[in-house]
Amino acid sequence: MEEVVTATCIAPINIAVIKYWGKRDDKLILPVNDSISGTLSTDQLCAKTTISASPTYTETKYWLNGIEGDYKSNIRMKNVIKAMKKLAKKKCPKNKALKYKLHICSINNFPTAAGLASSAAGYSCLVYTLAQLYGIDNEDLTPIARVGSGSACRSLNGGFVHWLKGVSPTGEDSVAVQLCDENYWPEMRVLIIVVNEGKKAVSSTSGMSLTTTTSELFNYRIMKCVPERVRLMKKAIAERNFKDFGELTMKDSNQFHAVCLDTYPPCVYMTDVSHRIAAIIHGYNKNAGETCVAYTFDAGPNVCVYLLEKEVRRFVTMLAAFFPCDAYDEGKFVRGIPIKYLSKISEEYMTNLGGSSYIERDRVKYIIHTKLGSGPKRLDDPDDSLLGADGLPKANPKVQSSIEQEVSVPPCEPHEVPPENVMYLGVPWGPQWAEQWLAQWGKPNGASWGGHGFPFGAPPGIAIKMDAALRSKVKIESTESSKSTSSNESDDATTSAARPDRQNAFQDLESKASTLNKLMDVDVEMSRVNQ
């Protein structure tokens, strides 16, 4: 029996800063304007594809995220495979895999069809894996990736990438070229703020088609605005000028969505939460006195944020304050590259950014923290294959660099050590200290010990919210359901009276909180917010 030929690869997503929207040729997927994007690291976000070719396969099949698709009706995938085989026959005519049917299995470790460039990662990974399978080296694959999904051509290069629209009717000059690699601007970071993991109502393909035929603003954008923005964006990247980079990114995102709204019927991708986050970012930049954070929205509600490394901790702490959620309480609010939250965000600062009227629980699901990365990579470990020896998807495939497996370090910035070792208000704080505290002092009235608190200056388990009228008062509130107590703890008042040492300890803690209150321009109530 002839040997089965297999290849497994991963490929990144890319987030455009100058948007691609609209085609001059739907079959060849030729864009009406140039676009520029940043390729994100596969350490956090990627598509993973395994392709096997075997003489025993009777037909070509594919599976996406564990579900078998209809290959016969997938015109774009068939066009990509046809183009890759044509190229392989020229470059590697003796490759035996060219004679066989294919089994293709692909998974994403991020939400699919939610406006996070899943098709870009998927088709770039398909093309690159086919190149590995057929032995194609040192070829520009971007024109073929483009036929699968336009933005996929940008994911074949790392760093910042420029996709040229080209002028040829056959598309040979519509290619993606690298402006700089991922190491050129090492301080650049990207946050993906996930507000909705569901599939968007209007696909990018449908939206583009409607826009090109109905929007009166569309031609003005592609003729007057985009060419100049591309020139300025290339200059900003070359100079590592974040102010210009950020402003151009946000302006182009705004105009892209304005064109979508000018489409008839309108294509509405952003939600009220999307707009709220955009407004908060403008407030953040105004408060900073310069553009230091930039949003951009693809065709979906989720927010992509470009910012420099030095801004990540403050921005994420601020965002967590505006959008508290279960993921934060469980230590999973930020996934990907770990961060340490800042210890406090002042009430005045929050007011400047919109105040308490902006605070809404569970409107942001989580944040993915990543950076710029390289293009696709081959994985040679057999355990990385998504297909079993029988050519069918594995029941429990190895997920590459899953963001679900990584959580951030809890808040501990002032101490620069893990929270297990910190001293807070003169008291050791952290998971292992909670048991010692309870053993020594008992459980205060109604108190319990939980996970992360609301991030107004809190270590794990405590939310800080100062009460201006009661600046010396400290209250520890319960956030857990009551648990059965032993007989010697049946009456908290009696126990408290019988144990003056515990009362003295809490009085000392209260005094220290009062002192801290005078040093910080926020109101504090030691209370884990119960919502």
Model-flagged regions — what are they?
Residues 260, 271, 473-499:
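Long, low-complexity, serine/threonine-rich intrinsically disordered regions
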Residues 1-114, 128-138, 366-382, 387-404, ...:
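ATP-binding N-lobe of GHMP and related small-molecule kinases
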Residues 1, 91-189, 196:
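Gly/Ser-rich oxyanion-binding loop with an adjacent helix/lid
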Residues 16-19, 47-51, 152-155, 159-164, ...:
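Short beta-strand scaffold segments in enzyme catalytic cores
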Residues 472-488, 505, 518-522, 527-529:
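Short linear regulatory motifs embedded in intrinsically disordered, acidic Ser/Thr-rich regions
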Residues 422-470:
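Composition-driven detector of proline- and glycine-rich
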Residues 411, 493, 526-531:
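A positional/structural detector of protein chain ends, strongest at the extreme C-terminus
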Residues 2-26, 30, 180-426:
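C-terminal nucleotide
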